[in-house]
């Protein structure tokens, strides 16, 4: 959980409000009977709005009619370069997806710009009618996910 929160906060601070001095984000934890629910929200520009695409990527996306859901999913799959253009960057969002894929957390969901991305059930992912200015993350930690993390191969 720590590495996910660290990546989310770092992205929020570095990218959410690049032209502002104040960085606004909210982290919340809810303790349920058999799980802990986490949310992280920033009120920046949103992941898709801060994405820098190369001209080739823009052209390929345009001719293939690639929608925002696939683009956002591609960002988490490291298909686009970091907006900082540093070669050693673009590891944070793929790391968040990897933590969910390894099932160290469960039910990861992201809302940003006009996209709802459900990593646990991709069929639920969709383009939204209204734009969220910023990024919202939701995930759960259960006994099963903790046990999975404790027995991982290091």
Predicted regions and their residues:
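Flexible, glycine-/charge-rich segments associated with ATP-binding catalytic modules
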Residues: 62-154
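Short, glycine/charged-enriched secondary-structure capping and boundary segments
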Residues: 53-55, 124-125
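Acidic ATP/Mg2+-coordinating residue in the GHKL
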Residues: 42
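Short coil/turn segments at secondary-structure boundaries
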Residues: 52-53, 152
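A short glycine-centered beta->alpha linker in the GHKL/HATPase_c
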Residues: 46-52
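Conserved ATP-binding N-box helix of the HATPase_c
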Residues: 1-32, 93-102
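Broad gene-expression machinery/nucleic-acid interaction feature
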Residues: 26, 35-37, 134-136
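Short beta-strand-loop-beta element adjacent to the nucleotide/active-site pocket used for signaling
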Residues: 30-39, 54-59
């Amino acid at each position: 959980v720590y590495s996910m929160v660290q990546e989310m906060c770092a992205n929020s601070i570095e990218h959410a409000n690049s032209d502002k001095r104040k960085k606004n984000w909210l982290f919340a934890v809810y303790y349920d009977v058999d799980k802990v629910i986490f949310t992280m929200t920033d009120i920046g520009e949103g992941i898709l709005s801060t994405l820098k695409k190369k001209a080739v990527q823009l052209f390929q996306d345009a001719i293939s009619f690639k929608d925002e859901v696939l683009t956002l999913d591609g960002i988490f799959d490291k298909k686009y370069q970091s907006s900082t253009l540093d070669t050693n960057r673009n590891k944070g969002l793929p790391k968040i997806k990897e933590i969910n894929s390894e099932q160290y957390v469960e039910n990861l969901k992201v809302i940003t710009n006009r996209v709802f991305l459900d990593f646990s059930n991709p069929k639920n992912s969709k383009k939204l009618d209204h734009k969220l200015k910023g990024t919202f993350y939701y995930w759960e930690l259960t006994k099963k996910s903790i046990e999975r993390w404790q027995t991982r191969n290091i």
